[in-house]
């Protein structure tokens, strides 16, 4: 049994202890309305460097805005010259430990770390909520939300719709959906429930087969995990290979069955340690990078963030 299988089995035991109930889209929308604020995760990725703004709770999960210059002309600054290549967005991870690395940060203060990430220019935050394997907590979402203005991703192993409700109630603006642990039916259902409620969904893949499954639901966010969750081997070529596959099949253009002009955004995850790594991933089409361990081990978080994204 792989570590991923072990984690999922533990997650099934945890989910079995949650109050039994059927979760409908209306329940999630009501929970979001009761919370009263949604931070636009996807818009924040489309505007790296800008400050997050709250939007009405009844939103649609984030609509990437049209990129404009100070003159208001998309893609061109004053004078009509081409705009420079847009900066890459950083999803900075609040992460104490992992099965592969053990304890990463002994002096772990989630609020302090989140504030340092925000001050250094992160676009969004990823918050580990798995307790047994990553020493995370749902309460970290609540604490961090009260301390910063950035949109928050609940980083966990979602296998049940009740976990989506938890994400809303504890303060997340986005959830992670790992294709490797979900059936096609679950993936479609959870993605639909989340987006209808106003949560962004980062749909994570690791290989071509998972990418093809993911693209059937026309996600706004595709995360490519460079770490094989079964072997824990890391290789940035994974993002390059799947980015090429995305370009060949869709060219990052809107899916034909989606009734709007929103493209799929590529997020590269894991194994990202240097500015060279970031530039390499940016060149192959990544709009954002999700980085945790190298930032948590970097000593001065602010300095490390600036080294990565400039």
Task: State each model region's role.
Residues 2-48, 86-105:
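An N-cap/entry alpha-helix motif that binds or orients negatively charged groups
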Residues 46-87, 247-264:
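Intrinsic disorder/low-complexity segments
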Residues 242-245, 297-310:
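C-terminal helical cap(s) of enzyme catalytic domains, especially alpha/beta-barrels
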Residues 7, 92, 117, 167, ...:
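Conserved, mostly hydrophobic/aromatic
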Residues 166-182, 224-231, 286-304:
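Glycine-rich phosphate-binding active-site loops on the catalytic face of alpha/beta enzymes
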Residues 159-170, 208-217, 272-289:
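Catalytic cores of alpha/beta
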Residues 94-109, 151-159, 202-204, 267-268:
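Active-site mouth loops of central-metabolism enzymes
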Residues 125-134, 151-160, 173-184, 199-207, ...:
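Catalytic beta/alpha-barrel core
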């Amino acid at each position: 049994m792989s570590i991923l299988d072990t984690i999922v089995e533990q997650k099934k035991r945890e989910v079995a202890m949650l109050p039994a109930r059927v979760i409908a889209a209306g329940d999630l929308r009501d929970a979001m309305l009761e919370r009263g604020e949604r931070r636009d995760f996807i818009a924040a990725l489309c505007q790296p460097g800008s400050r997050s703004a709250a939007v009405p709770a009844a939103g649609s999960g984030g609509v990437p805005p049209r990129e404009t210059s100070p003159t208001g002309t998309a893609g061109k600054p004053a004078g009509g010259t081409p705009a420079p290549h847009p900066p890459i967005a950083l999803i900075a991870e609040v992460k104490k430990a992992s099965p592969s690395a053990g304890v990463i940060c002994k002096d772990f203060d989630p609020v302090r770390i989140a504030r340092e990430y925000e001050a250094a220019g992160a676009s969004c935050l990823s918050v580990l909520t798995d307790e047994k394997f990553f020493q995370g907590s749902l309460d970290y979402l609540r604490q961090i939300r009260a301390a910063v203005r950035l949109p928050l991703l609940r980083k966990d192993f979602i296998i049940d719709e009740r976990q989506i409700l938890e994400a809303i109630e504890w303060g997340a603006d986005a959830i992670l959906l790992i294709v490797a642990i979900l059936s096609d039916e679950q993936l479609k259902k959870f993605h639909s429930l989340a987006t209808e409620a106003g949560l962004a969904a980062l749909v994570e893949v690791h290989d071509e087969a998972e990418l093809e499954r993911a693209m059937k639901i026309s996600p706004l966010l595709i995360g490519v995990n460079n770490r094989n969750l079964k072997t824990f081997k890391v290789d940035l070529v994974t993002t390059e290979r799947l980015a090429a596959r995305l370009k060949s099949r869709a060219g990052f253009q809107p899916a034909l069955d989606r009734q709007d002009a929103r493209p799929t955004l590529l997020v590269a995850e894991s194994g990202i340690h240097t500015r060279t790594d970031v530039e390499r991933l940016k060149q192959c089409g990544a709009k954002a990078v999700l980085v945790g361990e190298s930032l948590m081990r970097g000593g001065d978080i602010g300095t490390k963030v600036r080294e990565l994204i400039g």
